[in-house]
């Protein structure tokens, strides 16, 4: 009787232990399957931080970035070709003849690092719109300059706006234009806008200077830059919203190495001054 009871207990316990072993084996197999899954399947589930723009809107964004680069360089071409007329009109001394051109490149080169850092923190669209708006204002101010000191100062301020525009435009194209040929075309068009604008500035600046004067060339560039600013308001992708409790000003104070930026900018200013 005791043997029969022991056999009964043995047969009833055996399936339980077998099912536990099979359960642990299946869990191990599932874990191994997850570990052996391709990386593409894992990364495909990760959310994208920036949305890719539709083709039509991406084209407008690229045109806006290219246009801002074009008209900034256009003004440099106008300055070069119209410099004798500008000198006679504004009474620019011989010792300051190079400064309407050099002041622009001096400030543009020295402020690029700072502008890129600010764009990363404050948002590319916000920084781009600020730069494009003040670019139009300072281009117009160059056309309205009454003496040599004013046009040099306005050209220097225009260089700062170009430094603000460039890294933000690059960031927008990098993050929101489809990777591959569309993005490559965006960078190519933006880079091509600089020499193309300078060439057009030389040609059209000479035509303006010989006919109606050099000032209207800046008026045309200012109106076009203002139009590109308005285009940017409607077409540039929205910046990511900051997390709760994080203001833009606080992030600017904490996330940017202001001492490093100041030292780097000072070095670039001195280098540009020597080369100028």
What spans do the regions from the language model cover?
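Helix-loop-helix hairpins in multi-pass membrane proteins, especially solute transporters
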Residues: 120-259
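Phenylalanine-glycine-rich, low-complexity intrinsically disordered regions
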Residues: 260, 265-276
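MFS transmembrane alpha-helix packing/gate-lining sites
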Residues: 75, 104-111, 161, 193-197
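Cytosolic juxtamembrane N-terminal segment immediately preceding the first transmembrane helix
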Residues: 2-74, 88
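Conserved kink/hinge residues within transmembrane alpha-helices of Major Facilitator Superfamily
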Residues: 80, 105, 109-116, 201-202
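Extracytoplasmic
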Residues: 57-103, 111, 165-166, 170
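Residue-level signature of the transmembrane alpha-helical core
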Residues: 63-66, 70, 102, 106, ...
